[in-house]
C-alpha cells in the first residue's frame, strides 16, 4: 500500500499507482525472474513523478523460456474502476537486443484514428511504454518480448470510457506520472475532451450533442439524437468552451431538470458540492412570469426539482420549463461570448419526459 496522501476539501486521501506503473513493475519483476531463475516477492521501480514504488509480486511463474507475474492495481482513494485489477507481464528473450512490448488478453485495441497510437495497436500509452522499457533496461541490455495482459480487463473495460474514445476489447495502460492522485477532475475533463475530438473525426464539426449522463443519452435516443454525442457529467462549462473553441457549428444540450435548472441561472458546474440553485431557478423564472407569491412559496418548500416541477404544472405554470430552456441558452451564449451562437437546450423530467410546457 502506497503511503502517500493529499489533502482535498479538508480530507486526507491516499494516493495510488497507475496501470502503467503496474505494467512496468510486472515487466521488471518478470525479467529479473527470467534472468535469475528466482521468484521475487517485491519489485522496485521509479515513476515519472519521482516517487519510487515497492510493489508486491503476485502469481509468479518461471520456466526456461519465459517468466510472468502480476501487480495488483491500487487506486488509493480514487474512485477508479480498475482498482484491484491484476496487471500481468510475460517476458521472453529475443536474440536481437531489442525490447518489443505487446498487449495481450484484456488490453484494449485502438479502433479509431486520433488517439495516442495507430488503429489496431494495443492501448498502452506512450509514458507507460517508456516506463516498461526503462525498467527492463535496468535489468539487462538483452532483447525481450514483453506482453502485458489483464485477465479481468475486458469485463472491467465496460465500466470505463474506453468504448467512447475508440478503444475496444479491454482496459488501457495509462498514466503520465505513475501515481494516481485521488478525485482527479482534470482526468475526467480530459476524457470528455478526447470524446469531443473523436466526434469531430467521425462526424465533423456540424452539431454536437452534450448530455450529463446515461438518462440524457436515453432521452436523446428517443429524440433521434444519438450520433455526435458526448457525456459531460457535471462539467458543463469546461465542455461548452472546449466544443465552441474547437469549432462546432452548433450545440444541443439535453439534461434533467435537476441539473439544467441550475444551468438556467448560470451555474456551469452542476455537482451538488459546488452549488444548489434548483428552487432558486424555479423562483426566478416564476417571478418573471408573474406567478403568485403563494405558488412561489410552495415551490420554495419543495425538496427536489421534480417536486417543484409538479407544483408548477399543477398550478398551470408548466411553461416555466420553456423559460428555463431559453434562459439556459442565453446563459450559454453569454458564457462562450457569442450572442448569435446556435445552441438548443432540452430539459426533461424523469416522469414527464420532454415538452412539458
UniProtKB/Swiss-Prot annotation:
UniProt superkingdom: Bacteria
Alphabetized GO MF terms: cobalt-precorrin-5B C1-methyltransferase activity
Listed pathway(s): Cofactor biosynthesis; adenosylcobalamin biosynthesis; cob(II)yrinate a,c-diamide from sirohydrochlorin (anaerobic route): step 6/10
This protein's UniProt keywords: Cobalamin biosynthesis, Methyltransferase, S-adenosyl-L-methionine, Transferase
Reactions it catalyzes: Co-precorrin-5B + S-adenosyl-L-methionine = Co-precorrin-6A + S-adenosyl-L-homocysteine
GO biological process: anaerobic cobalamin biosynthetic process; methylation
Any Pfam family matching the protein: CbiD
Keyword Lipid metabolism: no
Record-annotated disulphide pairs: none
E.C. number: 2.1.1.195
Enzyme class: transferase
Similarity section: Belongs to the CbiD family.
Protein's recorded name: Cobalt-precorrin-5B C(1)-methyltransferase
Originating organism: Alkaliphilus oremlandii (strain OhILAs)
Amino acid at each position: 500500500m502506497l503511503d502517500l496522501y493529499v489533502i482535498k476539501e479538508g480530507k486526507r486521501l491516499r494516493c495510488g499507482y497507475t496501470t502503467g506503473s503496474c505494467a512496468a513493475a510486472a515487466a521488471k519483476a518478470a525479467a529479473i525472474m527470467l534472468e535469475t531463475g528466482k521468484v521475487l516477492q517485491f519489485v522496485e521501480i521509479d515513476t515519472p513523478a519521482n516517487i519510487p514504488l515497492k510493489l508486491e509480486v503476485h502469481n509468479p511463474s518461471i520456466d526456461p523460456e519465459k517468466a510472468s507475474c502480476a501487480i495488483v492495481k491500487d487506486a488509493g482513494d480514487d474512485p477508479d474502476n480498475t482498482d484491484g485489477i491484476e496487471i500481468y507481464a510475460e517476458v521472453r528473450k529475443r536474440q536481437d537486443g531489442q525490447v518489443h512490448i505487446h498487449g495481450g488478453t484484456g488490453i484494449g485495441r485502438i479502433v479509431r484514428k486520433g488517439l495516442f497510437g495507430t488503429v489496431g495497436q494495443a492501448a498502452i500509452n506512450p509514458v507507460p511504454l517508456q516506463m516498461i522499457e526503462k525498467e527492463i533496461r535496468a535489468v539487462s541490455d538483452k532483447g525481450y518480448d514483453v506482453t502485458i495482459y489483464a485477465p479481468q480487463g475486458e469485463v472491467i473495460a465496460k465500466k470505463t470510457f474506453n468504448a467512447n474514445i475508440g478503444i475496444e476489447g479491454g482496459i488501457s495502460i495509462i498514466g503520465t506520472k505513475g501515481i494516481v492522485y485521488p478525485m482527479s477532475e482534470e482526468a475526467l475533463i480530459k476524457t470528455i475532451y478526447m470524446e469531443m475530438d473523436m466526434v469531430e473525426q467521425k462526424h465533423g464539426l456540424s452539431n454536437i450533442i452534450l448530455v450529463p449522463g446515461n438518462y440524457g443519452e436515453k432521452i436523446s435516443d428517443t429524440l433521434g439524437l444519438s450520433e455526435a454525442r458526448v457525456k459531460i457529467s457535471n462539467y458543463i462549462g469546461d465542455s461548452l468552451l472546449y466544443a465552441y473553441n474547437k469549432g462546432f457549428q452548433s450545440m444541443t444540450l439535453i439534461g434533467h431538470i435537476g441539473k439544467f435548472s441550475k444551468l438556467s441561472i448560470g451555474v456551469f458546474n452542476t455537482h451538488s458540492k459546488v452549488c444548489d440553485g434548483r428552487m432558486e431557478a424555479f423562483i426566478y423564472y416564476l417571478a418573471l412570469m408573474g406567478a403568485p407569491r403563494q405558488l412561489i412559496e410552495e415551490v420554495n418548500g419543495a425538496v427536489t426539482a421534480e417536486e417543484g416541477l409538479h407544483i408548477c404544472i399543477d398550478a398551470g405554470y408548466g411553461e416555466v420549463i420553456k423559460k428555463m430552456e431559453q434562459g439556459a441558452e442565453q446563459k450559454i451564449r453569454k458564457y462562450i461570448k457569442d450572442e448569435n451562437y446556435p445552441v438548443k437546450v432540452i430539459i426533461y423530467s424523469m416522469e414527464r419526459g420532454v415538452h412539458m410546457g
